[in-house]
Amino acid sequence: MDQPDAQQYPHGGVPPVTPAAIGRLAAVGGVGFLVASLASDLVIGPFPGPDTPPAQLVSFYAAHHAQVGTGGLVLAVSGVFFVLFGLAVWARIRQASASPLLAGLAMIATALAAVTTLISAGTYGVLGDVGALHGVDAAALQAWHIMGSDGSLADSFSTFLFLLAMAGAGVLARALPRWLAWTAMPLAVLQLVPNQFGFLASLLFLVWTAAAGISLLFGRRDRQADRTAYAVREEVRHA
C-alpha cells in the first residue's frame, strides 16, 4: 500500500481533510438523519396527543410498548447521523477560514441538537419499558408521555441556533451554498413557532439537512470538474 509522501506533510501531522471527504460525510449524515428520523416516526406509528386521558394511555402502551421503544432506538441513531452532518459543516467552515466564533457556534448548536434528540429517544425508550409493566401509575405514565409527545423549547431552540449558524456560514463565510443559507433563515424562525407550524418546520428541517448534505457532496464535485476542465483548456490553448 502506498504511503503518504513525508514532504507533503512536513510537520508529521495528520493529512488535512479533503473537500471530497467532507462532502461524503455531510451526505451520509444529512440523508441518514432524514431517513432515521422518518423511520422512527413510522416505527412508532400513530401517537396519542399530550391531552390523551391516562386510562387510554395505559391501554395504548400495553399494546404498543415494543414499537415505541424500538422507535426511540431508531431516533437515537438519527442523532448520531446529525452529529456526522454537523462535523462535516464544521470542517467546511474551518476550511473556508471563517471566524472561529462561527465554527464554534456550529459545533455548539450541533451538540445541543444531538443531545435533545437523544433525550427524546431516551424518553421513548422509557415509555417502551414501563408500558410493558403491570400496575404502572397512570399519572406517572401520562407525565412521561407528555414529555415524549410534546416538543420542548430546547428542541426548537437548538435547531434554531443550528440553522442560524448555517445562515452565517453561507452568507458571511461563503462556506455553504448561498441557497442553503437563505433558506435556513426563515426555517430557523419557523422553528420557534408553536403548534402545527412548528411541527411542519421540524419536518422541513429534516429535508433541508438531507438536501444540504447532497449539495455539499455534488456541489464540490461540480466545482472540481469545472476547475479541471478550465486547466485542460488552458493547456490546449498554450500548446
State what each model feature region is.
Residues 2-239:
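Hydrophobic, aromatic-enriched alpha-helical segments typical of multi-pass transmembrane helices
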